[in-house]
């Protein structure tokens, strides 16, 4: 009766251990059971029952080892995949920094254009105070053309800057979604590891 109780305890421990850290203990328990089976006097029925239990434990060890190896290989492939993703992210971030630097230069250029336009406006007001001079009118027309060109350049710079801001926002959103996906994958793997004892129990 005591032997049956010990076997039940061993079986429960094997079921609770599942994959991972309990494998070493499962093997140690199997070795102890084998030693006990070799040096104890059992009736044929008890000996056969003990033998079948040891074979079941051995099969569990082999199954756990195969499953662990499979998970290990899958993790290696996932790590290679993640490394590729991280490399792409790093390249995207570097590209984003370059675009930001370019946008800053465009902003400085737009500020200079604005300053020049203000100076041109001030000069135009002075010129308008002398409309009777033919040469002054010619200069005013030239200034108007320059103002139109500068205004067009400024609009183009502002449009390009707005586009860069939108592209950078999309990039940051993509990076955040990817990080969330990776965290979800890690959580799912953790949940699968916790649920594996229940699967072995079934």
From Swiss-Prot:
Record-linked Pfam families: THOC7
Family according to the record: Belongs to the THOC7 family.
Subunit description: Component of the THO subcomplex, which is composed of thoc1, thoc2, thoc3, thoc5, thoc6 and thoc7. Component of the transcription/export (TREX) complex at least composed of alyref/thoc4, ddx39b, sarnp/cip29, chtop and the THO subcomplex.
Matches recorded under InterPro entries: THOC7/Mft1
Gene designation per UniProt: thoc7
Protein name per UniProt: THO complex subunit 7 homolog
Localization per record: Cytoplasm; Nucleus; Nucleus speckle
Region (Disordered): 181-202
Gene Ontology molecular function, alphabetical: RNA binding
GO-annotated cellular components: cytoplasm; nuclear speck; nucleus; THO complex part of transcription export complex
Source species taxonomy: Eukaryota, Metazoa, Chordata, Craniata, Vertebrata
Coiled-coil portions: 86-167
Major place of residence: cytoplasm
Keywords carried by this UniProt record: Coiled coil, Cytoplasm, mRNA processing, mRNA splicing, mRNA transport, Nucleus, RNA-binding, Transport
């Amino acid at each position: 009766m005591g032997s049956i109780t010990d076997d039940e305890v061993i079986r429960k421990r094997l079921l609770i251990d599942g994959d991972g850290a309990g494998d070493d203990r499962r093997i140690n328990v199997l070795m102890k059971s084998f030693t006990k089976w070799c040096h104890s006097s059992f009736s044929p029925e008890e000996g056969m029952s003990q033998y079948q239990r040891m074979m079941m434990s051995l099969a569990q060890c082999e199954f756990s080892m195969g499953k662990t190896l499979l998970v290990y290989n899958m993790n290696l492939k996932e790590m290679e995949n993640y490394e590729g993703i991280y490399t792409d992210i790093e390249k995207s971030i570097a590209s984003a920094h370059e675009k930001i630097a370019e946008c800053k230069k465009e902003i400085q250029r737009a500020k200079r254009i604005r300053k020049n336009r203000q100076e041109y406006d001030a000069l135009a007001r002075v010129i308008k105070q002398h409309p009777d001079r033919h040469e002054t009118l010619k200069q005013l027309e030239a200034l108007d053309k320059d103002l139109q060109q500068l205004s067009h350049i400024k609009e183009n710079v502002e449009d390009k800057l707005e586009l860069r801001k939108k592209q950078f926002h999309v990039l940051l959103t993509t990076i955040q979604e990817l990080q969330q996906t990776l965290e979800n994958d890690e959580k799912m793997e953790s949940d699968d590891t916790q649920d594996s004892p229940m699967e072995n129990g079934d």
